[in-house]
Swiss-Prot record:
Destroys superoxide anion radicals which are normally produced within the cells and which are toxic to biological systems. InterPro entries: Mn/Fe_SOD, Mn/Fe_SOD_BS, Mn/Fe_SOD_C, Mn/Fe_SOD_N, Mn/Fe_SOD_N_sf, SOD_C_sf. GO terms for molecular function: metal ion binding; superoxide dismutase activity. This is Superoxide dismutase [Mn]. The gene is sodA. GO terms for biological process: removal of superoxide radicals. Binds 1 Mn(2+) ion per subunit. Its EC number is 1.15.1.1. Mn(2+) binds at H27, H82, D164, H168. GO terms for cellular component: cytoplasm. Its cofactor is Mn(2+). It catalyses: 2 superoxide + 2 H(+) = H2O2 + O2.
């Protein structure tokens, strides 16, 4: 398989004024595209990997040949992480979760506001580059963060929501104000997509 950028379900300016057009365009066409290019380069010459998605590769890193494992971890993770990220954003997003995900969040974290507080703290505390995640682990919700482009899938956890806290995701608009960027994220979350991911992961 040749890995490709997923088609964005909205235009670069659709998330304004929350996420700016320039950042979205650079993030997608430069950063994500580089992960796709480098992943394709890494797996070239390994036909045994040709049928595997990026998600499958990072879920089973031990099955990836050792000489390309680091590249697949970084670039396969970058491709899988960003593919999820674009899908859980929406110009019609925001508000609060509904359905099974709402019930599970309240069961695990108390209230939606308490969940937000814990998620924000995980995203703000991630030193350097990485991600904050809401994941399903053994049927229960957890908040975790990962370094660089590491994926929760590599730890057997299924992501429901993910927030990119690499500086490339926010610096043009928010500069060093990561907490402001994190708070803005809640205005553009596609809860319908998050609900689907949660239901599929249970």
């Amino acid at each position: 398989m040749t890995y490709e950028l997923p088609k964005l379900p909205y235009t670069y300016d659709a998330l304004e004024p929350n996420f700016d057009k320039e950042t979205m365009e650079i993030h997608y066409t430069k950063h994500h595209n580089t992960y796709v290019t480098k992943l394709n380069e890494a797996v070239a010459g390994h036909p045994e990997l040709a049928s595997k998605s990026a998600e499958e590769l990072v879920t089973n890193l031990d099955s990836v040949p050792e000489d390309i494992r680091g590249a697949v971890r970084n670039h396969g993770g970058g491709h899988a992480n960003h593919t999820l990220f674009w899908s859980i954003l929406s110009p019609n997003g925001g508000g609060a979760p509904t359905g099974n995900l709402k019930a599970a969040i309240e069961s695990e974290f108390g209230t939606f506001d308490e969940f937000k507080e814990k998620f924000n703290a995980a995203a703000a505390a991630r030193f350097g580059s990485g991600w904050a995640w809401l994941v399903v682990n053994d049927g229960k919700l957890e908040i975790v963060s990962t370094a660089n482009q590491d994926s929760p899938l590599s730890d057997g956890k299924t992501p429901v929501l993910g927030l990119d806290v690499w500086e490339h995701a926010y610096y043009l608009k928010f500069q060093n104000r990561r907490p402001e960027y994190i708070e803005t994220f809640w205005n553009v979350i596609n809860w319908d997509e998050a609900n689907k991911r949660f239901d599929a992961a249970k």
